């Protein structure tokens, strides 16, 4: 009985092959150092919340949304059809693979471009759904040393 419970719990801890998950405080530090804290008025907590709900802190995440016909790239799941690559508008002027680097430099640069637009962070429906009106945003930085 104990062995099956332990094995079940271990199954939840195993990260799929190829995944590169950053810790919450590591993400917060990189975003802070990249100048996102209060960039265009959005707190660092908002950015960390967005990163969690978009990619679960996986900077190498690629998600193909076949229902809506787009592919999201990186920590913030930026749409290839709008923000990166050779076959779309490429508003961030970079390849989509550049958004998959764990150093997050290009990701932060592109995020700044996106949030300067008329929708702000509302450009990410996930932010509107899970972060915008959250009364627990402070938890995203709990215990983090920036």
UniProtKB/Swiss-Prot annotation:
It comes from the Eukaryota. GO terms for cellular component: acrosomal vesicle; extracellular space; nucleus; sperm flagellum. SUPFAM superfamilies: Lysozyme-like. Disulfide bonds join 25-144, 49-131, 84-96, 92-110. The active site is at residue 54. It is found in: Secreted; Cytoplasmic vesicle, Secretory vesicle, Acrosome; Cell projection, Cilium, Flagellum. InterPro entries: Glyco_hydro_22, Glyco_hydro_22_CS, Glyco_hydro_22_lys, Lysozyme-like_dom_sf. Residues 20-146 form the C-type lysozyme domain. PROSITE patterns: GLYCOSYL_HYDROL_F22_1, GLYCOSYL_HYDROL_F22_2. Expressed in testis and epididymis. Keywords: Cell projection, Cilium, Cytoplasmic vesicle, Disulfide bond, Fertilization, Flagellum, Secreted, Signal. One of its GO terms (molecular function) is lysozyme activity. It holds the Pfam family Lys. Residues 1-19 form the signal peptide. GO terms for biological process: fertilization; fusion of sperm to egg plasma membrane involved in single fertilization. CDD domains: LYZ_C (cd16897). Monomer. Belongs to the glycosyl hydrolase 22 family. May be involved in fertilization. Has no detectable bacteriolytic and lysozyme activities in vitro. This is Lysozyme-like protein 4. It comes from Homo sapiens (Human). The lineage of its organism: Eukaryota, Metazoa, Chordata, Craniata, Vertebrata. The gene is LYZL4.
């Amino acid at each position: 009985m104990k062995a099956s419970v332990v094995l079940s719990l271990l199954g939840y801890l195993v990260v799929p092959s190829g995944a590169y998950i950053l810790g919450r405080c590591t993400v917060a530090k990189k975003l802070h150092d990249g100048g996102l804290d209060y960039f265009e008025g959005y707190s660092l907590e908002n950015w960390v919340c967005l990163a969690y709900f978009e990619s679960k802190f996986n900077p190498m995440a690629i998600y193909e949304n076949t229902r809506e016909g787009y592919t999201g790239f990186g920590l913030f799941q930026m749409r290839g059809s709008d923000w990166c690559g050779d076959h779309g508008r490429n508003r961030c002027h970079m390849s989509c693979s550049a958004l998959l680097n764990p150093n997050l430099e290009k990701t932060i640069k592109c995020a700044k471009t996106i949030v300067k637009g008329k929708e702000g962070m509302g450009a990410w429906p996930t932010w509107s759904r899970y972060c915008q009106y959250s009364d627990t945003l402070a938890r995203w930085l709990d215990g983090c040393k920036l």
